[in-house]
Amino acid sequence: MSNVMQQPKIGFVSLGCPKNLVDSERILTELRTEGYDVVPRYDDADMVIVNTCGFIDSAVQESLEAIGEALNENGKVIVTGCLGAKEDQIREVHPKVLEITGPHSYEQVLQHVHHYVPKPKHNPFLSLVPEQGVKLTPRHYAYLKISEGCNHRCTFCIIPSMRGDLDSRPIGDVLAEAKRLVEAGVKELLVISQDTSAYGVDVKHRTGFWNGSPVKTSMVSLCEQLAKLGVWVRLHYVYPYPHVDDVIPLMAEGKILPYLDIPLQHASPRILKLMKRPGSVDRQLARIKQWREICPELTLRSTFIVGFPGETEDDFQMLLDFLKEARLDRVGCFKYSPVEGATANDLPDQVPEEVKEERWNRFMALQQQISAERLQEKVGREILVIIDEVDEEGAIGRSMADAPEIDGAVYLNGETKLKPGDVVRVKVENADEYDLWGSLV
């Protein structure tokens, strides 16, 4: 008969954005380190943790449904994450939830787990945790979160009320985590935060230390150091501050990926003012032109909102005109949706749903045409591709221009001997609006 004690089991569900995924990874790493077993089925677990999203109404609904499912299948549920900042809203629907915490409340979550499912007598030989921690992404890429919160007060957003003001991680800690990930086999680091280009503003860009040398806490310094690790480094959620210009030469030199994810949101100065976003469209177009002159391989991704309160046909036409001139590579578009607690809800002249839908369709049709033309320019060229999946039909990867889950893919039909994480040279043979097809060189 075995004398090995049964490890307590925790079920876990993670909803929302990559930043939430990083929070989940941190909680799971601590649980595994303490000897808890993480299981895929709620009915096998001693307790379930639901890490929620509360950014838009559909995310709130998804989170509430996930909580309900966990309660039905298990009964012992702890809720954390962004929606946890609205405890009353959760308890109104699910009064039987045991405990509720807000986002990045790691220690509170663990304390609650210890209370309801006491910490096991940990045997390190039974529950080994890799040095880089538990990761919910494939082994070859990882999200690297550099800060929490945001100092902006965009009228459509409630993130600051949930995650607080900007709180930058010490640059030495960020770089140490990046190094551990690379040593564990990660080939691509995706730098994320609510506002990546504001990194270090809250600490007045104080000097930190890495490998015994002083390093300034700033996005540019961080990129310079990450470049030394010899892996792909991709920047997300980059607010268009002037100093963003300083990272473009690093991209041109091949030190970090020539990829910028800049959420511009709109192009009408009047709508941008209502959103409390920077509003110089001409300046932004000039910068895009300058960036491309310095780094011709640059891929630009952005997101936009159509149907924002007060948006007229003239405002929307300005947005379409901007798309035609900017010719962005990757674009996401959302129909404005009221978010509980957002100040934009109180703005006059709400746009009817059918108008939002019609504008969204026009926006997407134009951008699909632009995207198809941009990708067609790559046919006949050779590009580097990182492999994500391999099955009996071939391999699927991404180019330097493609972030996981949100951008396009590169299909290599018949290439069944590659492995996820391989970086290969590919000749592009075909393209559509979003994806490429090619063969190994």
From Swiss-Prot:
GO biological process: tRNA modification
PANTHER family: RIBOSOMAL PROTEIN S12 METHYLTHIOTRANSFERASE RIMO (PTHR43837), RIBOSOMAL PROTEIN US12 METHYLTHIOTRANSFERASE RIMO (PTHR43837:SF1)
Enzyme Commission number, as recorded: 2.8.4.4
Domain Radical SAM core: residue ranges: 136-373
Residue numbers binding [4Fe-4S] cluster 1: C17, C53, C82
Enzyme type, top EC level: transferase
Protein's UniProt name: Ribosomal protein uS12 methylthiotransferase RimO
Record's keyword terms, sorted: 4Fe-4S, Cytoplasm, Iron, Iron-sulfur, Metal-binding, S-adenosyl-L-methionine, Transferase
Domain MTTase N-terminal positions: 8-118
Function: Catalyzes the methylthiolation of an aspartic acid residue of ribosomal protein uS12.
Family: Belongs to the methylthiotransferase family. RimO subfamily.
